[in-house]
Structure formats: structure tokens, C-alpha cells
Amino acid sequence: MKNYDVIIIGTGAANIVADAAIADHKSVAIIERGKFGGTCLNRGCIPTKILVTAANRIREIREAAHLGIHVESVHADWAAVSRRMWHKINENDSIRTYYEQFKNVTVYAGTASFVDKKTVRITDANNHTEEITGTAIIIATGGRTHVPSVAGLQESGYITSETFFGAAYPPEPYKSLIIIGGGPIGCEFAHVFNAFGTHVTLVQHNIRLLPKEDESVSAYMLQQFEDYRIQVHLNQDTLSVRTENGEKILTCSDRTNGKKIEVHAEEILVAPGIKPLSDILHTERAGLATDARGYIRTNEFLETNVPGIWALGDCNGQAPFRHKANYEAETLAHNLFSHQPTENWRWVRYDAVPAVTYTYPETAHIGWTEASAKKAGFTVETAINHYSATAKGYALGFEEGARNDGFVKLVLDKDSKKILGVHIVGPEASILLQPFCNLFYCGTQTIQIREAEIASPTAARLRKLPLTRTLPPLSVYTLSETMTPHPALSELTMWTRYYYEKK
């Protein structure tokens, strides 16, 4: 049985940890059951944003008349857009080749599962198995679509974001599409296909669209979807699916009054959220503690309850975003392989995780919503500024009082004037959010304890100090510890730090 200094399960954000371990001359095993690069690069952030950007341009051209630009027709070439997308996805094949060149790295193609606290079994596509052991094990397995139990759904067939970017990818836009789920994934797909001419019906269990956004943003986006003739049914229980005359028919009922409706479409996209892969990983064999949903519990140093095992990314249940996973990976790589004194260890914080939904227009936020801040006991005041109130906003075509007039909303602590949250809906909201992200991370921070019962001896000691960290606002190193919404264009400025020769 082969033994490694480091075993890494998953090749998304965990590649940051792999690179640090390789540079530190550790023997490394990398295990991947799918395509290298993880969800984001292959079936998430990157391919969806290529489709979203094309959809944005379609909308902008169609709406150019209010700027005095008249276009007779728009031809959307789905095949050409798709070729660009697949070209980008296929670039990820080089990631495996990159890691295979290192003498201290072994790449395993297969599904990882625990045998015990130090042993991992790899099962390949031919059902052959091999067991390896590791001194340090990094879990970064991501998540998968949560498919609800709906009568007839399996028999009628459906797609998810995973299968969509695979064999189920359509050669042309669907004529009609039902989307189950009104979170970021469902709303982005609704925008894309609506722009390309698909009749889209969105069915949402929650009483709000994009329920993790501030209520003002949710209301704005619902209005925009309705204006674009996306049919939205909120507060619905999905009851059953059947197929008739080549169409899929979904029956749902209002959760308040029980009224049933039926919606018809060529295809159904299931996107109500994600769940972890703990069952496939067999976390119980390693004695790993998980929460009620199956996510691996981690502390502020990404330690699990099992010494020598860490978890990052979607699998730990904390904000399923690639930029959050990158931030965690940078933190873990620093702590494990930088050879810094433990007093220089970094910790993760989740009170300042930016989030962006790439609809038309974009939504972006960081920190508390108005409602959550009030619930937490803050005395809250807000400030709202609309796009139309700025010269550039007017130049873009926004007018005061118009239904599409986007805005920035600040949620403030009335007593201290501290910014508690920022919420933006409008063009390039993801870029406009970045200055606030930087503000949230600058200055002196004190360790925030998570999962107090999970504590290595080092973690316990650092908590008692308590550990603090100062991030100067003009230091290039501060950029390394500041989250940047992925894949916003603000990465162009924030990631320039990687070209600093002494990084």
C-alpha cells in the first residue's frame, strides 16, 4: 500500500493546496472522479457565464432603441456560442497533464471513499480498486444537485446543471423549459434560455425569488423576470411529473391555499440547490462529523474532528461559491505549507462572503440583509442610490422611476455607522461590489471561533491568545486574503497580485 504525505480528493479549488504541497516537496496523491478542474470550470461558473454573456448581449441589442440605436433583428447563433463554451471547457484537460509531470505526484482517476481515518480506497471506471494512506488528507469533493422526490420525475426524465454540460447539452435552445428552483442556478438558466427565445417557466418552493438576496432585490428581480415574460410560480410544492404527446407536464400546488396548476414544457431542469457527496465518500468510516444535511463540519482552520483531515469548498456547507473555496484553499495552503510560525496562521471567516447571481441585470451582495441585521439585534438604517441618479447610469439609459432602474443599498448600524451589508442590482453589480469586499477585509481582525469542539492543540492555543491579524489597506498581500466574486471582471484587478514577482 502506497503512503503519501498529502492526499487531495477533488481538483477544483484544492489545486491551490496541491500546488503548495508540490512546491514544498511533499509526496502528493490527487484523486479525481470526473473532469479535472471541478464544478466551476466544467459545469458551473465558467460555462454558464459564457452563455450568460451571450444572453446579455442579445438583451442589450434588443433594448438599444432607448439609446437611439435601432436594430432590425438579432440572430443568436447557439452553435457558435456553444463552440466557444466547449473550447473553454476542453482546456481543462491540460490540468491533469500538468500534475502528471511532477515526480512527487500520483494522479488517480476514480472515486475516493474512506476505509478508515488514514486510508482511502480509489475505485476506477472498471471497478478496480486500490487503497492508499496519507498523513494529511484534504477533502474538496464539491457537491451535486439535490433532486427532490417527485412522483414521475425519474420516469419522465430531467436535466441538471451537471448533465446539461455533458451528453444532455441541446443542439439548439429548447422551445420550452420548466426550471425547478429559483436560486442563482435556476435564475441564471432562466435568463439564458429566455434570451435565446425559449418559453421559460420557473417553479420555486420559496415564497421569494432569489431568497438569499435582500427582499428589495428579490422583488426587483421578480419584476424583471415578469417583464421578460418568464413565468414565475412562487411558494409551490412540486407534486408530480408525467409525459403526454412528447411534452413533460409538471403539477404543483400553492403551499398556502393548495391551488393546483399544471405547466408544460419540452424539458425540465432541476436546480433547487445542492447536497454533499458524503454518502459516496463514506465519511462515517473515517469518523468524520457531519451536520444534519451531510456536510462535513469544519472549524475556522478548516480542520475536521479527525486529526489530519481537512475539508474545503462545497463539501463543508459554507457558501457554495468557487471564490469561497479558493479563499479556503489559500488559507489552508498557507497554514500547512508556508512554514510560517503558527502565530501567523490564517483563519476563515464567513461573515463577508460576496455572492453574485449573473442574471440580467446582475445581483451582488456582501454581509447582512436588512431583515437579517434587524433579526440579529442591530438598529438598522439604510441608504439607497439608483443608477439613474448618476451620470453614467443615465448614459446607460436608466431613468428615474423606471421599472428597470437598478440600485445600490447599504445596510448600516445606526449607532456606529458601520456598513453591515451591501446589496446591488444592475449592470456590472459584481464589479461595483468589489470595493466593499476590500473594505470588509481590511484592518485588524480577531479570530472567529467556529465549531468550538473541533480543535487541534494548535487551534486551541491560538484561540486562547486570541489570534489577531492586521491587513493594511494598501498592501498587495491584503489582496490575497480578500474574496473576489468569481468570475467577475474585478478578478482582472484583484488577481494582478499573482504577477508580483515576490509573491
Q: Where are the regions a protein language model picked out?
A:
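Glycine-rich dinucleotide-binding loop and its adjacent helix/turn
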Residues: C45, T141-H199, V203, Q231, ...
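A conserved FAD-binding loop/helix module that cradles the flavin
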Residues: E213-D214, Y220, L312-S372, I431, ...
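A Rossmann-like FAD-binding core segment of flavoenzymes
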Residues: E72, T106-A109, S113-A125, F196-E300, ...
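Glycine-rich flavin
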Residues: K2-Y4, A20-K26, I31-Y174, N206-L210, ...
